[in-house]
Amino acid sequence: MDIFLAILPAIFWGSIVLFNVKLGGGPYSQTLGTTFGALIFSIVVYIFMKPVLTPTVIGVGIVSGLFWALGQANQLKSIDLMGVSRTMPISTGLQLVSTTLFGVIVFHEWSTIISVVLGVLALVCIIIGVILTSLQSEEEKNAEQAGNFKRGIIILLISTVGYLVYVVVIRLFNVDGWSALLPQAVGMVLGGILLTFKHHPFNKYAIRNIIPGLIWAAGNMFLFISQPRVGVATSFSLSQMGIIISTLGGILILGERKTKRQLTGIVVGIVFIIAAGIMLGIAKS
């Protein structure tokens, strides 16, 4: 039962972008709707959990939420250019590398020889995985498609910065996840509005995309529930499995077309990235 709870964040988070794309509306309406969904869920959780909200918790939570919105908005823009099945493995790999390096440099997470060896192997696996999932078909090598890929990667780098700050600012100030949930959601909505208001995102698609926001917040909640039961290392490792759902869902559910060579690269690349996530989880423990 505990392992099942720990897998739920991966299931929920892995399906978010599939819902975003299926519900439609483009990256701006999708971002805004998702943030409102997260806010609704967080308000309900706050009513039942009643965590203590200090000025530090509120401030840090809002900043974290603002940067989450930056990460999510740019991830969705990249999906618009490159598709789910290509964007998500690369995005996951970049997030793992950035958060790992930050953890090593700032928090000195790799304190033993075993953790250093596992960590370095994990980073190598991530690089291999990202390269394999980025393989282009001959058709995609034309000028327009190649331009979309380059722009998508640049946008993903911005997204990675957003997700990195979203994660590490909470840890830097040692803020409890339950306490940060509501302020985070407020920051997400503020960030969503600031990033999208010029593009007139307030429409029926924004309302539809409240659903992915509810799903994201539920995944967050199950992560908080599972961590004390299975440990941070195991919950972190299992949460990376969402890449399977999002990537294969992009191909099977959204109908993104891939050559046999690309499919092989994606499957093998996912295996490398998941292996890296597991090794990083062990290195953190």
Curated annotation (Swiss-Prot):
Q: Among the entry's GO cellular component annotations, what is one?
A: plasma membrane
Question: Which positions, given as ranges, span the membrane?
Answer: 4-21, 26-48, 52-71, 84-106, 110-132, 153-175, 180-197, 210-227, 232-254, 266-283
In terms of CDD domains, this protein maps to:
glucose_uptake_GlcU
Q: Which family does it belong to?
A: Belongs to the GRP transporter (TC 2.A.7.5) family.
What is the disulfide pattern of this chain?
A: none
Q: What membrane topology was assigned to this protein in its record?
A: Multi-pass membrane protein
Q: What protein name applies here?
A: Probable glucose uptake protein GlcU
Q: Which organism is it from?
A: Bacillus anthracis
Locations listed in the record: Cell membrane
- InterPro entries, alphabetically? Sugar_transport
Name the job this protein performs: Involved in the uptake of glucose.
Q: Does the keyword Heme apply?
A: no
Q: Which Pfam families match?
A: Sugar_transport
Q: What UniProt keywords apply to this chain's record, in alphabetical order?
A: Cell membrane, Membrane, Sugar transport, Transmembrane, Transmembrane helix, Transport
UniProt keyword annotation of Transmembrane helix present: yes
For molecular function, the Gene Ontology terms on record are: carbohydrate transmembrane transporter activity
